A protein has these predicted regions:
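N-terminal Sec-pathway targeting helices
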Residues: 1-17
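A short, N-terminal "cap"/entry segment at the start of jelly-roll beta-barrel domains
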Residues: 25-99, 186-192
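Conserved hydrophobic/aromatic beta-strand scaffold that supports enzyme active sites
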Residues: 93-95, 120, 130, 139
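Tight coil/turn sites that cap or link beta-strands
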Residues: 99-101, 124-126, 136
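Glycine- and acidic-residue-biased ligand/ion/polar-headgroup-sensing regions
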Residues: 101, 106-111
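Eukaryotic short linear interaction motifs
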Residues: 103, 130, 148-150
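Short acidic-glycine-tyrosine-enriched beta hairpin
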Residues: 109-133
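Double-stranded beta-helix
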Residues: 134-189
Length: 192
């Protein structure tokens, strides 16, 4: 019995050590990662098309991103608007680009919504933000980091609150398509 308890501690310590090493490897990888998109580029394109009808603005933005980054934006037949419930807010998103370290998506709400930013390492204690979007708010969203780790926040409301498993499937399929596109572009060049 004593040996069994001791073995559990050894396994727990080993698991903790593996997790620490894995976290360090991911941290180092992100530090050396070259990104496809730049914050300034996405912001400039968003400003360029601001004020247009959102459908026209989004279609022009997609064309421009494909021109600037061939092989990194999903083709039209794989673009799909998906409902999103996260942090208490609701809207719709269309994933344009996804990799292990960055994403670009279109997001909006026709009715307006509010919620919170979630708990992240960016926000210290008491610094999490509330968000509120009015009716017909549409935007381009760009994110960097360990993207698979953000899926917990993005999908928790869908799994445990709305239990909309079809939306869960569509969301995961969109992300898988983005990863597949990045992988084939990496292996075969810009025209997978």
């Amino acid at each position: 019995m004593q040996w069994a308890v001791g073995r559990r501690w050894v396994w727990a310590a080993l698991l903790l050590a593996v997790a620490a090493v894995l976290a360090q490897v991911v941290w180092l990888w992100l530090g050396t990662q070259s990104f496809v998109f730049q914050h300034e580029e996405i912001a400039q394109l968003a400003r360029q098309y601001a004020g247009l009808d959102h459908e026209l603005a989004f279609s022009r933005l997609i064309v421009e991103l494909r021109r600037l980054h061939p092989g990194h934006v999903l083709p039209d037949e794989e673009l799909q608007w998906v409902f999103v419930n996260a942090g208490g807010w609701m809207g719709a998103m269309c994933l344009l680009h996804a990799s292990l370290s960055e994403y670009v998506l279109l997001f909006g709400t026709a009715l307006g919504s509010r919620g919170h930013s979630g708990e992240t390492v960016v926000h210290g204690p008491g610094e999490a933000t509330a968000v509120e979007w009015g009716p017909n708010t549409w935007m381009v969203e760009y994110g960097r980091g360990v993207i698979p780790s953000t899926l917990a926040f993005a999908l928790t409301d869908t799994i445990f609150s709305t239990q909309d498993f079809l939306t869960l499937f569509y969301t995961l399929r969109a992300y898988a398509r983005g990863l597949r596109l990045e992988f084939t572009t990496y292996l075969f060049g810009q025209d997978p």
